[in-house]
């Protein structure tokens, strides 16, 4: 039990600490405080009490032992105060009230009152119940958050937001908020259905064995119910807050990912191409929120996300190809490693003309070609190294252990290169959006507004 030490007003001033010494009986009869004005007003310092031997003979009687015990109690208390210990500190220097009473030391003889610090039972019960409520609420919400695959949902939502920002027409903040929330809800619904359909397969892979449906935290039925609620909310928000086209694309993405792609994963390697279409729809959603889909720039952005899926996923699936095969999934990395690496290189090269199309159709300025070429060249180089190693491993002989290890290393480099590549290209496209810097200079007053050139730019964008 912790104690709160409350100091009584002192009665007299004592210039020394003789009553601490064990060769005197003053410690039981003094009614004065042992601390003077000097020690109450100055900064406390740690003092080590040294016993000064007396010339008188000390009789080892029972009364002297009792006096010694009582003196040690007060000495321990005083030492604790002088050492500035916290009330909650666990120490051997505690006041044993039972021992004090047994030695007939009255509380008035102690220079300060000892008040036990006890928690109110009602407040303690309230704090305990609130902590349990928070824990229970977290244990309920967390599995549903994991059910949405938050990392993938964030990536899908960001690709939609970036496309909305790159589109040539003005940006509306309420429209952007509805687009963000609706896209995230639709993506979460698709992922929830995907997890609800594959617990028997996911439990066979170390990568997916920790998913909430596999662990039994959520049943497949609950996953479907959650997907129905979030999907309905997402499509409704997109329909009312953005436009019907975006709402339809969100619903189409749920169907493609959760039913068609998920079913094809166990039947054919074509599932990778279908999954790439799923990744290309969010940029179309962002573009359609402010601009018509008949503009070629929309399809250049969608093509960019479509092509990016292959070096990203093919590199990821290469290192876990055996896990996919053991779980019953049909993936290109497990069925045909050479095709897997070749497709990754092929679509890395496709990034160059797609970025060129953004400048050609007036979405970005021509400086974007030089900036994006650096990122595209790096990704293509990593894909080329990966393809060359796979080609060497499967040319006329069984791959060696060193060759397999090198292929795994190049696959990891390509995967992390793709993780950095996509944000870099999208950010560069937003920075080099057509007329972006002119609008900034006009807004800051560094450039005069040219209505004629502005109207011609708008006509060219339409």
UniProtKB/Swiss-Prot annotation:
Keywords, in A-Z order: Heme biosynthesis, Membrane, Mitochondrion, Transferase, Transit peptide, Transmembrane, Transmembrane helix
Listed transmembrane segments: 152-172, 173-193, 237-257, 269-289, 296-316, 348-368, 411-431
GO terms classed as biological process: heme A biosynthetic process
Chief location category: mitochondrion
The organism's place on the tree of life at top rank: Eukaryota
Membrane topology: Multi-pass membrane protein
GO molecular function: protoheme IX farnesyltransferase activity
Recorded family membership: Belongs to the UbiA prenyltransferase family.
Summary of the function given for this chain in its UniProt record: Converts protoheme IX and farnesyl diphosphate to heme O.
Protein name (database record): Protoheme IX farnesyltransferase, mitochondrial
Organism: Debaryomyces hansenii (strain ATCC 36239 / CBS 767 / BCRC 21394 / JCM 1990 / NBRC 0083 / IGC 2968)
